[in-house]
From Swiss-Prot:
Cellular-component GO terms for this entry: membrane; nitrate reductase complex; periplasmic space
Organism ancestry: Bacteria, Pseudomonadati, Pseudomonadota, Gammaproteobacteria, Enterobacterales
A molecular function GO annotation: nitrate reductase (cytochrome) activity
Gene (name only): napA
Family: Belongs to the prokaryotic molybdopterin-containing oxidoreductase family. NasA/NapA/NarB subfamily.
Cofactor binding note of this UniProt entry: Binds 1 [4Fe-4S] cluster.
Protein name: Periplasmic nitrate reductase
GO biological process: cellular respiration; Mo-molybdopterin cofactor biosynthetic process; nitrate assimilation
Residues of the signal peptide: 1-31
Taxonomic source organism: Escherichia coli O1:K1 / APEC
Length: 828
């Protein structure tokens, strides 16, 4: 029986009305309702951003056929954004990859060959050969992996174990390096522990919201709906929005501030000065819970050492700091006067004062939100530190309705990249590879020889590009990310390395992305509810979901790929004799046996799954792999302020916010009565630091790595739009989302367009020192840049805006500044 949408809706209405009235139901309505009831519903977190909305997934006949907001989910309370409502369609693009593809010519691998279907065994044969050759000839530093904040928790954990323990290479980094690394380093420097102290429940209790470089209306729309409700329901609530261009979040703003790029550092120091000058310091909090330090300056821009800017820097890459007195700090910020700040930022004085008054008013609860405007910044760590200063000076932290809150852009940038520790320098639960004690903890838990994990920090994302280009990194596996489109400086620093004959590139992805098409081997990957998974969102909420359908064709999850590939290596092939001598019982064993099929991981039987429950990996291996990996991983954080609940609890709950102690989640960390790690009488305790005190840093304004000049006379900022997510590899395959925003445009001020003889709809060539792209002029619409700046989203594979961007990074976090480079326009 086929029905139109109208007939379907009408039949549902008839059935509902008849049931309410106690009447008999027409046959067609009964049939439709029966068909609807045949849909099986189960919970899952949304596949997109870091908000962590809960959805109900409807499956029927082996396919995801529907999706709705989960009314029991505390994050979104039944509401989805436009992307969330179309989640089912991301899985069924016409070009979905279903079998491995290898570049071949004359029946064998060839770097210049055509993509040819092969089997998984053939794919692993080629990978095994390339990995073993590189390891034998050049050692562990010649191989690398680029992962994702979209990995599930156990996928990231399995990948980290394989590289850091198995292959003894720390050259593994996630794409969260491009979005959250500055937040991580900022948290660690100020508090000694990563991730926000507050939660989304703050929204309903706050008096003021300040957005620093965050367009929440489009990038975190569900949270924005809660802020909007709070603002419109309470006339005394204030919203301030700071950005380098006007966007949709300004529609709600009481104080909408456009500032000159990079000058947010000036504004932050001005507010600190205002707080001090107006005696608005919370003296009791400040005296008990805060230390003051002066940070190193002139630290460079994370460019190659041969770059003139790096050569000129006095302290390139330095995160050093020294204690300072309050009087010295007061004198430091005193330089950032209202007059100087207005001049440097271009912001009117009255707007600056209004903003400062929000923080200084002891009766106003303030939340600071930020995302990429802060983090993708050559002084992103400093920006994070400076906003913490404002909350630490006023004591507006770790209490309901108050606090600094770093929002995340990916569904598990927190839960996987940060908490699991898939960065090149990290291990689980905030541990790091450079700390011998931390390495020892991991090696003992993993039952591997002491000294297995290298002490040297591996290559971060941008350094991986450079090493590939230089021929130092020769085998490179990327998963769950599209870095050829998303990463900076494609022309100069990425594409050359990927297409270098010395290098072999593997891309695991569900679709033929820009990255996949630039690779040598493509592995088809299972998506979202085609596997069992777990994500951790921005408020420390860990959420689980079960596999609900099977992947098409031969597509396999990232977890399956990692675990099965580990079977190809024996310990003698990857570890030196001195390590094997410490644990001779591991001789002859495969990395699969050493890392995954261990007594610790394999102790949970498949029988724990319901008889009809899908779980392809566990049923193939004969034990509950996901549970074993999670419980082993969770051990690292329990008792250390990162406590995760038992595995089974998450399948019953709509997520739990860590630390979870004695079955109770934590909404606000570091404060007495809210955090189980803060004892009675302590008030506040920032227990990531040895003395329990947070740090206020004195850090100055320093200019951007590249700014407009006479030839390249415009700032370029890049970012996202509501309808698409990151590089659009999923959302552009949803017809409705594609139609809503079919191609990227160049947002430009009308006067800048007029001065260049450009009109709305014209084609325009955007040119930087590194490359050029053709786009379309947009002088109206949702984004309205000031004169001197243009904005372009990066979702469009036909307009690779990252051909233009500079690979300058924050020297401390190694995160790229995608918000500031110089371009010129040429009419086409």
């Amino acid at each position: 029986m086929k029905l139109s949408r109208r007939s379907f809706m009408k039949a549902n209405a008839v059935a509902a009305a008849a049931a309410a009235a106690g009447l008999s139901v027409p046959g067609v309505a009964r049939a439709v309702v029966g068909q609807q009831e045949a849909i099986k519903w189960d919970k899952a977190p949304c596949r997109f951003c870091g908000t962590g909305c809960g959805v109900l997934v409807g499956t029927q006949q082996g396919r995801v056929v529907a999706c709705q907001g989960d009314p029991d989910a505390p994050v979104n309370r039944g509401l989805n954004c436009i992307k969330g409502y179309f989640l089912p369609k991301i899985m069924y693009g016409k070009d979905r990859l279903t079998q491995p593809l290898l570049r071949m010519k004359n029946g064998k691998y060839d770097k210049e060959g055509e993509f040819t279907p092969i089997t998984w065994d053939q794919a692993f044969d080629v990978m095994e050969d390339k990995f073993k050759t590189a390891l034998k000839e050049k050692g562990p530093e010649s191989i690398g992996m680029f992962g994702s904040g979209q990995w599930t928790i156990w996928e990231g954990y399995a990948a980290s174990k394989l590289f850091k323990a198995g292959f003894r290479s720390n050259n593994i980094d996630p794409n969260a390096r491009h979005c959250m690394a500055s937040a991580v380093v900022g948290f660690m420097r100020t508090f000694g522990m990563d991730e926000p102290m507050g939660c989304y429940d703050d929204i309903e209790q706050a008096d003021a919201f300040v957005l620093w470089g965050s367009n929440m209306a489009e990038m975190h729309p569900i949270l924005w709906s809660r802020i909007t409700n709070r603002r419109l329901s309470n006339q005394n609530v204030t919203v301030a929005v700071l950005s380098t261009y006007q966007h949709r979040s300004f529609e709600l703003a009481d104080n909408g501030i456009i500032f000159t790029p990079q000058s947010d550092l000036v504004i932050l120091n001005y507010i600190a000065n205002y707080i001090i000058q107006n005696n608005a310091i919370n003296q009791d909090f400040f005296s008990k819970h805060v230390n003051l330090r002066k940070g190193a300056t002139d630290i460079g821009y994370g460019l190659r050492p041969t770059h003139p800017l790096e050569k000129a820097a006095k302290n390139p890459g330095s995160d050093a700091s020294e204690p300072m007195s309050f009087e010295d700090y007061k004198a430091f910020v005193a330089e950032y006067t209202l007059e100087k700040t207005a001049e440097m930022t271009g912001v009117p004085k009255d707007q600056l004062e209004q903003l400062a008054q929000l923080y200084a008013d002891p009766n106003k609860k303030v939340i600071s939100y930020w995302t990429m405007g802060f983090n993708q910044h050559t002084r992103g760590v400093w920006a994070n530190n400076l906003v913490y200063n404002l909350h630490l000076l006023t004591g507006k932290i770790s209490q309901p309705g108050c606090g600094p809150f770093s929002l995340t852009g990916q569904p598990s940038a927190c839960g996987t990249a940060r908490e699991v520790g898939t960065f090149a320098h990290r291990l689980p639960a905030d541990m790091v590879v450079t700390n011998e004690k931390h390495r020892d903890i991991c090696e003992k838990k993993w039952n591997i020889p002491s000294g297995t994990i290298p002490a040297k920090i591996g290559l971060h994302a941008v350094a991986q590009d450079r090493a590939l280009k230089d021929g130092k990194l020769n085998v490179y596996w990327t998963m769950c990310t599209n870095n050829m489109q998303a990463g900076p400086n494609i022309n100069e620093e990425r594409m050359p390395g990927w297409r270098d004959p010395r290098n072999f590139i593997i891309v695991s992805d569900p679709y033929p992305t820009v990255s996949a098409l630039a690779a040598d081997l493509i592995l088809p990957t299972a998506m979202w509810v085609e596997k069992e998974g777990a994500y951790g969102n921005a408020e420390r909420r860990t959420q689980f979901w079960r596999q609900q359908v099977q992947a098409p064709g031969e597509a396999k999850s990232d977890l399956w790929q990692l675990v099965q590939f580990s079977r190809r290596f024996k310990t003698e092939e990857v570890w030196p004799e001195e390590l094997l001598a410490k644990k001779p019982e591991l001789r002859g064993k495969t990395l699969y046996e050493v890392l995954y099929a261990t007594p610790e991981v394999s102790k949970f039987p498949v029988s724990e799954l319901a008889e009809d429950q899908l779980n392809d990996e566990s049923r193939e291996l004969g034990f509950y792999l996901q549970k074993g990996l999670f419980e082993e991983y969770a051990w690292f954080g329990r008792g250390h302020g990162h406590d995760l609940a038992p595995f089974d609890d998450y399948h019953k709950a709509r997520g739990l916010r860590w630390p979870v102690v004695n079955g109770k989640e934590t909404q606000w960390r570091y404060s007495e009565g809210n955090d189980p790690y803060v004892k009675a009488g302590e008030g506040y305790k920032f227990y990531g630091k040895p003395d329990g005190k947070a740090v206020i840093f004195a850090l100055p304004f320093e200019p951007a790595a590249e700014a407009p000049d006479e030839e390249y006379d415009l700032w370029l900022s890049t970012g996202r739009v509501l309808e698409h997510w990151h590089t659009g590899s999923m959302t552009r395959r949803v017809p409705e989302l594609h139609r809503a925003f079919p191609e990227a445009v160049l947002f430009i001020h009308p006067l800048d367009a007029k001065a260049r003889d450009l009109r709305r709809g014209d084609k325009v060539k955007v040119v930087s020192r590194r490359g050029e792209v053709i786009s379309i002029v947009e002088t109206r619409g949702r984004n309205r840049p000031p004169q001197g700046l243009v904005y372009m989203p990066f979702f469009d594979a036909a307009q690779l805006v990252n051909k233009l961007t500079l690979d300058a990074t924050d020297p401390l976090s190694k995160e790229t500044d995608f918000k500031k480079c110089a371009v010129k326009l040429e009419k086409v």
